Amino acid sequence: MTPALKSTFVLAHRHLLGIEGLSAADITGLLDLSEEYVELNRQVDKKRASLRGRTQVNLFFEASTRTQSSFEIAGKRLGADVMNMSVSSSSMRKGETLMDTAVTLNAMHPDILVVRHHASGAVELLARKVDGSVINAGDGAHEHPTQALLDALTIRRNKGRLEGLVVAICGDVMHSRVARSNILLLNTMGARVRVVAPSTLLPRGIERMGVEVARDMREGLDGADIVMMLRLQRERMNGSFVPSSQEYFHYFGLDQKKLAYAKPDALVMHPGPMNRGVEIDSIVADGAQSVIREQVEMGVAVRMAVLEALARNLPNA
C-alpha cells in the first residue's frame, strides 16, 4: 500500500496560470509536496488515487514532447482519466474559436484542463469560460509556471536552498516564457537573478523585473551558482536577432571555457529542447555539472504535486 503523504498543502487558487500571484509560502508548499512525489516515483508502485474519478484534459495548441508527456504521466499516476486533445484534428482547425472550444469542453465537465497556447494570455481567457481548474502549460512568451517550479526543485535539491543564490539566465530572454516565470519565482524566493544576452534578445525594461543585466558571458557568469541556458526561439522571431548560429555560439554559447567563469560547483540547467552547438556545447550539456536530465525527472513530480494541490480544492475532494 502506498503510504499517505505528509504534506497537507492545498493551493489556495482555483487555477495555476502563472508564478505571478503565488506567495513564497505557496511555492514552498508545492516544492515540499513535490519532494514526496520524487520519492514515490522512484518506487516500483508509483500510483496514488488522488485523482481517481477525475477527468484531466491536456489541450495543447503548440507541439510539445516533454511537457505534454510529463503531465500525462503525472495524471495517470494519480489515477485520473487523461485525455490528450489533438488540435491538428480538432474543430479549431475548421474555424472554431478558442472560446467556443472552451465552452464545448466545459459541457463535458472536465475537472482539470492543462493548456498550452501560442498566444500570451490565451490560457487565462480560457480559464474564465470553464468550471474546472486550469493549469498553464505555457502561453506564448508569457509564463510557464510548472517549468519554473521544477527548476526551483532541482536547484533546491542540489543546493539546499534558493535564497541568496546567484542565478544566471542566459540566451533568448526576450521570447522565453521560462525566463519570465523563473525570474518571478527566484525573486520571490530571495535569489539574485542575472540575465545574460545580446541587446537584441533582451526585452525593453527587463531591469524593472528586479534582475541584473549583463551583455557578455564573462560578466554574466562571474560568481554564478546556477547557469540556466535558453534556446533561440526562432519560431517566435519575425526578423533576424543574431547574425548566425555560429557567431551566437562563439559569444553566448556555453562551453567549458565560459563555464569556468562561474563558481566551480555551479549547476548547468536547460529547459529543453536543446540546440547543441548553438546555445550549449555537448561536453557541458552531458558533463558532471549538468542537471538537465534531473530537471526532466523533477518535472513529473512537480506536475503531480500541482495536480494534487489543485484537486484538493475541487468540489467533493
From Swiss-Prot:
Record keyword Lipoprotein present: no
Gene Ontology biological process terms, A to Z: 'de novo' pyrimidine nucleobase biosynthetic process; 'de novo' UMP biosynthetic process; amino acid metabolic process
Gene: pyrB
This protein's pathway: Pyrimidine metabolism; UMP biosynthesis via de novo pathway; (S)-dihydroorotate from bicarbonate: step 2/3
HAMAP family for the chain: Asp_carb_tr
Organism listed in the record: Rhodopseudomonas palustris (strain BisB5)
Keyword line: Pyrimidine biosynthesis, Transferase
Catalytic activity: carbamoyl phosphate + L-aspartate = N-carbamoyl-L-aspartate + phosphate + H(+)
Name by which UniProt lists this protein: Aspartate carbamoyltransferase catalytic subunit
EC number in record: 2.1.3.2
